[in-house]
Amino acid sequence: MNKKLFGVSFAQKKYDLALKYCQPAAEQGDPEAQYYLGLMYNKGFGLKQDYTEAMNWYLKAAEQDNKDALCSLANMYLEGEGVKQDYTEARNYFIKAANLGDAAAQYNLGVMYSSGDGTKIDYIEAKNWFLKAAEQGQAKAQFNLGVLYFNGQGVKQDYFKAVEWHQKAAEQGYADAQYNLAKIYYLGKGVKQDFVNAKKWFEKAAKQGHAEAQCCLAGLYIQGLGVKQDLMNAKKMARKSG
């Protein structure tokens, strides 16, 4: 029997079947099975939620350098799930996963260092971790890296690089990046002022329910910037933005 059938069953939300395949594999020391079993206990998928059991299986997988388990342990400490909230422990587990190349862990470290969660704010460290995740295509990291370049935090202010990283995240559909990119085009920061492109990116973010983008798009319709003046559409966008 393919021991990885538990992953397929889990993805299909067939938790009884996943447990059938997962339990014996986990007990035989398979780190991926141990992670999935921990996840099932953690979230109550097919089992009664049990944080103690979740941590037990996550730890077994983490000892074998399973990145998902390391991140899950970090998140348990970060959120105080079944343990006392401990940012230092969370950061330590994120660092282990990040050093194994996990983009989500790298992004989360960037967030912790940029926001000062359990540590002194350090924009240089934040930039380093965001960059590692961004280079792996992680949209939220690309967006945050763009913000650091725009504000000159941890790096020399560079509007061109701010645009570059916002663009990468925006093209992946990340609404906050689309909104920021639209503002950059609207203001002409690092790019030639371009109301057509501003409208394009405000519109993409607005379609995802981004309230500020909807409000800005309404403003463009009122003024006729980058689009033909259209008061009816302006009112429609304004209503959506609340």
Range-by-range predicted roles:
Residues G7, K14, E27-D30, K43-F45, ...:
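Short helix-capping/linker turns of helical repeat alpha-solenoids
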Residues P24-A25, K60-A61, K96-A97, K132-A133, ...:
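Canonical positions in the second alpha-helix
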Residues N2-S9, Y36-K43, S72-E79, N108-S115, ...:
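Hydrophobic face of amphipathic alpha-helices that form TPR/SEL1-like repeat modules
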Residues M1-Y36:
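N-terminal segments that cap or nucleate solenoid repeat domains
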Residues C215, G219, K228-G242:
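TPR/TPR-like (Sel1-like) alpha-helical repeat modules
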